[in-house]
Regions:
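N-terminal "arm"/small-domain region of PLP-dependent enzymes with the aminotransferase-like
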Residues: 1-37, 52, 137
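PLP-dependent aminotransferase class I/II
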Residues: 200-284
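Active-site phosphate-binding strand-loop segment of PLP-dependent enzymes
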Residues: 119-184
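Conserved PLP-binding catalytic core of the aspartate aminotransferase-like
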Residues: 266, 278-307
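Glycine/small-residue-rich loop that forms an oxyanion/phosphate-binding "nest" at active or ligand-binding sites
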Residues: 66-81, 155, 175-183, 187, ...
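PLP-dependent aminotransferase-like
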Residues: 77-143
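Phosphate-binding glycine-rich loop
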Residues: 36-39, 43-90
């Protein structure tokens, strides 16, 4: 009889179909011999590699148990900072977007304001700013760039002046989980603003997507050192496991895999976009490893057919 699989592919997880770098796999295997030791040295090596990659001092980097922990700690740190200063605080997010920042803010009893995307699915920066200006307190913006689920970028020439137009009473948490997949030259990492000295900009990234290490939980935050110091007060002290650390270092060093991950995603994206065009289905410009597209007919039926 023909073997069948009951495994369901969770497309909304945006996992990397390539799997991890072979060098990362070997690094994990090699780490078994030292699994009885704490990974302090390996954790330090990840920070050193990231600092070199982004051309910053190591004090700009904070590792997380996946970037979800970095997002949680950043949101919590900024909320507590505002509350300690006896200031009202709230989170402002585009809608739809990745919802972890929203969940963390709500868990702390902080109001969340959702600003609908513009008709073209881009961030409505005017309405986002209006939401902050209508509030007498501290505003934390969570901006996923490229955005999830639209996979669209916000160009630097638009985003950066907009951020700089705010007072220091507004903070910008830029989630760049999919930045390594971006092809559009209009994109520029928010780390540029951090390097310029802005203390109200925090950038998070992950090894889960581009480097296919989702199961090993390695992420990081990049911000000004004094901001990193404040955020790390809300982080676990032992948040990076040995296997994840050695895999992260090996992945950063494997330039061949990085090129393959980027190119294979670009090719796959184009194949899907061509198919959508042939089917007459509209889609948003994609810069991630997923595509936001039109569905004709009943959504529930579509979901059931995708599971079949």
């Amino acid at each position: 009889p023909k073997a069948t699989s009951t495994k369901v592919l969770h497309l909304n997880f945006n996992e990397n179909a390539l799997g991890m770098s072979e060098k990362a796999k070997q690094a994990i295997m090699n780490s078994l011999a030292i699994g009885s030791y704490y990974p302090d040295d390996q954790r330090a090596a990840v920070i050193t590699q990231l600092a070199a990659k982004h051309n910053v001092a190591e004090s700009f980097i904070s590792l997380g148990n996946g970037s979800s922990e970095n997002i949680q700690a950043a949101v919590q740190a900024l909320i507590v900072k505002a509350q300690n200063a006896k200031q009202a605080v709230r989170l402002v997010v585009p809608d739809p977007t990745f919802n972890y920042a929203e969940l963390y803010a709500k868990a702390l009893g902080v109001p969340v304001v959702k600003v609908p995307l513009a008709d073209d699915f881009s961030f409505d920066l005017t309405k986002l700013k209006n939401a902050a200006e209508a509030f007498d307190g501290v505003t934390i913006f969570y901006l996923c760039n490229p955005n999830n689920p639209t996979s669209m970028i916000t160009p630097a020439k638009t985003l950066f002046p907009w951020i700089k137009s705010f007072s220091q009473n507004s903070y910008f948490l830029l989630d760049e989980a999919y930045a390594d997949f971006v092809e559009d030259p209009a994109f520029e990492t928010g780390m540029t603003l951090v390097k310029e000295g802005l203390k109200n900009v925090l950038v998070t990234r992950t090894f889960s997507k581009f480097y296919a290490l989702a199961g090993y939980r390695v992420g990081y935050l990049l911000a000004q050192p004094e901001v990193v110091e404040e955020v790390e007060k809300f982080m676990s002290l032992d948040n990076t496991n040995l296997a994840g650390a050695v895999a992260a270092v090996a992945s950063l060093q494997d330039k061949t895999f990085a090129k393959l991950s980027f190119q294979s995603n670009a090719v796959s994206r184009q194949i899907v976009q061509n198919a959508l065009t042939e089917l007459g289905l509209k889609f948003a410009p994609s810069n991630g490893n997923f595509i936001f597209h039109e569905i004709k007919g009943d959504v529930k039926t579509y979901q059931e057919r995708m599971k079949a």
